[in-house]
Amino acid sequence: MLLLELKKINQTLETIHFIGIGGVGMSGIAEILHNLGYKVQGSDLVENYNTKRLESYGIKIFLGHVPQNITNVSYVVISSAINPDNPEIQEALERKIPIIRRAEMLAELMRLKCSVAVSGSHGKTTTTSLVACLFEAAGLCPTVINGGIINNRSTNAYLGSSNYLIAEADESDATFIHIPSTIAIITNIDPEHLDYYKDFATLISAFRSFIINLPFYGFAVCCIDHKIVRKLVDDITERKIVTYGIDSADAHIIAFNINTDIASSTFDVKISLPNVLGTTIIEKITIPIPGRHNILNSLAAIAVGIELDFGIKAIKNGFNNFKGVKRRFTKVAEYNMASIIDDYAHHPEEIKATLATAKNIANKQNGKVIAIFQPHRYSRMQHLFDDFMLCFADADILYITDIYAAGENPIEGITGQSLVDKITKNKYHDQANFLATLDDAVGVIIDNAVSGDVIIMMGAGNISSFANELPKKFGNL
C-alpha cells in the first residue's frame, strides 16, 4: 500500500478489516487507525482483553473467522500468525480485496512521523514503553504502538499529538527491515525464529539491514554487552551508532553502582558520546522495575533521550512516572508472605534474566525461588531444547507443565515431561518436576511457599490468566 493510498482511503465509506484483531500487534494498529478516523473492524477466534478494549471504543468485533465477516470491507489486514487457508483470507482473494500485512500497515503509519523502532530478541516491549515515557516527560506526546499493555495507559497503543511515533518492531519474519524508522534500537540478538530464517546468520543479516536502512541523519542504539550485537556494530561504518551496556567499558552509555529490590532498580550512568569531549555522570536514576535486564532496557531509552537533548530532569521524571508493562515481572498475588510474579519469559535467555532477578530478590529476603514454567510452541522447544535444559539454574524448585501449542501440531518426543526427564538425567537441576496441569500449581504453592519466597509463573500461553486468578483460587480454599 502506498502512503497516498492510505491518505485517500474514504474514512466514512471504506472499512479496514483485521483478521486476528485480538493479537497485541494487530490490536494496536487497529486502535491507531480508529483514532485517526478510519472505519475499522476485525475478527478473532476468542474474546480477550484486547478485543474487549477495542469494542469499548466502538470497533466492531466478530468472534470466529467466516467469509461473511468481510462482506462489506475494502481492505484486509493480516499478520504472519494467520494461516493462508483462513476462510476470510480465501474470501478476500476470491473477491480481489487488497490484503495488507501488519508490518506494511505499520510502515505506512510510521512514514507519517519521525519514528523510533525498537527491535531485538528480548526486551522490546519494556524498552518501547520506557522510550515513550521519556518522550512524554520531555513534552513530546508520541504515538505509540507496543507489543504489550503499558500500565500507564492500560493499552498497547495510543495516538499522540507530536510528530513522533515509537513502535515495537517484530523481527520474527524480516518485515521489520522495511520499517521506515529514523532511530533504531537493538536490545540483543539470539537464535529465535529459525523456522523462518533457517539459520542464525540470516537473522543477523536482517538486523544489519535494519540499521543500514536508516536515513543518513538517523542513528542506531545498540547493547554491546551482547556479543552478537557488538560484532554487528563493529562491522557497520555507514551509520551513526550509540552503544550502551553494563559490562562493556567502551560503551557510550554505562550503568554502574547498581542496586535492585523487588520493586525497583537504582543506578548511576556514565555518558561518553562519540565526537563529544568529556563525560557526564547522572547519579541515582531509579526505574520502578527490578532486574539487570531492565536496567539495560532503560539505558537504551536514555541513549535516545540524550541524543535528542531531553535533559537529565526529563529522563529522571520519565522513569519516575513509568508504571511498568503487563506481564513483565508483575506481582499478581501473595501467599503465606511469598510474592507470586507473572512474567512473559518464554525463551531461555528471557527465563535466565527473569530468574536472575528473582534470585537476587529472594536472597535479600532469605527466601527461595519457585519457578513454574509453561513452554510455548513445540517448534521453539525443539529448536532450543538444549538451551531450555540449562536456563533454570537460579530456580531452587522447578515445575514444568506440558507445552502450550499456540496452534501448532505436536512434535514426537518434544513435551514438558521429556524436558524434565532430560534436565534430571543430565543433573542440570536436582529439583525439576513435571506439572500435569496448571491447577496443580495451587498445591505446589501451598506446600512450598514461605515468607521471603519469590514464585515465578512464566510463559507466553495461558499461564498468565491462571496466575491472575490465583487470589480467587486461594480465597476459595
Swiss-Prot record:
GO terms (BP aspect): cell division; cell wall organization; peptidoglycan biosynthetic process; regulation of cell shape
Protein name: UDP-N-acetylmuramate--L-alanine ligase
Recorded GO MF terms: ATP binding; UDP-N-acetylmuramate-L-alanine ligase activity
Keywords tagged on the record: ATP-binding, Cell cycle, Cell division, Cell shape, Cell wall biogenesis/degradation, Cytoplasm, Ligase, Nucleotide-binding, Peptidoglycan synthesis
Pathway: Cell wall biogenesis; peptidoglycan biosynthesis
Family that this chain belongs to: Belongs to the MurCDEF family.
Gene of this entry: murC
Catalytic activity entry: UDP-N-acetyl-alpha-D-muramate + L-alanine + ATP = UDP-N-acetyl-alpha-D-muramoyl-L-alanine + ADP + phosphate + H(+)
Residues binding ATP: G120, S121, H122, G123, K124, T125, T126
Enzyme Commission number: 6.3.2.8
Domain of life according to the entry: Bacteria
Biological source species: Rickettsia canadensis (strain McKiel)
Cellular component aspect of the GO annotation: cytoplasm
Location of this chain's protein in the cell: Cytoplasm
SUPFAM superfamilies the UniProt entry points to: MurCD N-terminal domain, MurD-like peptide ligases, catalytic domain, MurD-like peptide ligases, peptide-binding domain
Function: Cell wall formation.
The keyword Cytoplasm appears for this protein: yes
Predominant subcellular localization, coarse grouping: cytoplasm
InterPro entries named in the record: Mur-like_cat_sf, Mur_ligase_C, Mur_ligase_C_dom_sf, Mur_ligase_cen, Mur_ligase_N, MurCDEF_pg_biosynth, UDP-N-AcMur_Ala_ligase_MurC
Keyword Cytoplasm included in the entry's annotation: yes
